[in-house]
Amino acid sequence: MASSLKLGLIALLGATAVNAAPAAEPVLGTSLLTSRASCTFSGSSGAAEAIKSKTSCSTITLSNVEVPAGTTLDLTGLKSGTTVIFEGTTTFGYKEWEGPLVSVSGTSITVQGASGAQLNGDGARWWDGKGTNGGKTKPKFFYAHSLTNSKIENIYIKNSPVQVFSINGAKELTLSGITVDTADGDSNGGHNTDAFDVGSSNGVYITSPIVHNQDDCLAVNSGTNVHFTGAQCTGGHGISIGSVGGRSDNTVDGVTVESCTIKDSDNGVRIKTVYGATGTVQGVTYKDITLSGIAKYGIVIEQDYENGSPTGTPTSGVPITDLTLDNVHGTVASSGVDTYILCASGACSDWSWSGVSITGGQTSKKCKGIPSGASC
């Protein structure tokens, strides 16, 4: 009897042990959670290690990383909720290629610069005065593509070889406290160093950027619900819509540019559409814009661009409607033009201008198709 009880007890304990086996699963779960930890990468191997480990880290800190020549710091496809922090100085090896130097994508992503951090493109190695129009092949800097409900903040970019931020396919993306400093390019052949190029995005909010460059401070080529506020733009070509037309997406709808200063630039406010193309520009507002030291045009709106240059002949395929200019004021050089409007017949309508005062330059005798509510 005792022997039978003993055997029964052993069998019972064994069955209990088997039934208890699933209790080990929470331990595995805990292990999986800890794999999404904070990771720090640095030095010449930092880029490769970060790329390899990017989906295993909840926080990716890049400390004085040296990105090899011809390599993208590829942080695309990050897990939702990942934070990327740049510390110290991030540098990039030299090679003639198209780039980008950095690329980030994902949902609920935060990209931020620590205090004193800098992404230094050392663009003078590529600058030849030609930008993307010839000469050396130059890498674009930062692709912010396919970012959803994300933010990029307190990033300082120094001396980009060519265009800086390419924002494409973004939804609800905020960029705040961004500095784009390519001032050295003024005297060293910097060209086409656009700060922010926006395309095919819905909900882009760029606040308080400080920009010194040699091309557009902002260029919205397509997209909806784009807000550009509190910008300080120096040098370059002004704050632009377009050129619109000739791409797969040719709709600009709902752009607000507000409380910005533009100084020592070729242009102030600029809207340009492509000759012979189709598309739409509507719901654009420029409000509380201050211009100073503008060399060519204080306000320039034209529907005649072809191959990057004006033709003098506007076409109506990309109408410009519901355009508001409110308190846009400032000065243009005596050799420049205060306001220039070149619209095809009936292609510009429903414009509202108030408090617009551009002085110092010449009055254009070539304006055409000026809609009611505007003056040239």
UniProtKB/Swiss-Prot annotation:
Residues 1-20 form the signal peptide. Keywords: Cell wall biogenesis/degradation, Disulfide bond, Glycosidase, Hydrolase, Repeat, Secreted, Signal. It comes from the Eukaryota. It is an enzyme of class 3 (hydrolase). GO terms for biological process: cell wall organization; pectin catabolic process. The active site is at residues 215, 237. PbH1 repeats lie at residues 170-208, 223-243, 252-273, 281-303, 315-360. Its main location: secreted. One of its GO terms (cellular component) is extracellular region. It catalyses: (1,4-alpha-D-galacturonosyl)n+m + H2O = (1,4-alpha-D-galacturonosyl)n + (1,4-alpha-D-galacturonosyl)m. GO terms for molecular function: polygalacturonase activity. SMART domains: PbH1. Disulfide bonds join 39-57, 217-233, 343-348, 367-376. It holds the Pfam family Glyco_hydro_28. InterPro entries: Glyco_hydro_28 (IPR000743), Glycosyl_hydrlase_28 (IPR050434), PbH1 (IPR006626), Pectin_lyas_fold (IPR012334), Pectin_lyase_fold/virulence (IPR011050). Its EC number is 3.2.1.15. It is found in: Secreted. Belongs to the glycosyl hydrolase 28 family. This is Polygalacturonase. It comes from Penicillium griseoroseum. The gene is PGG1.
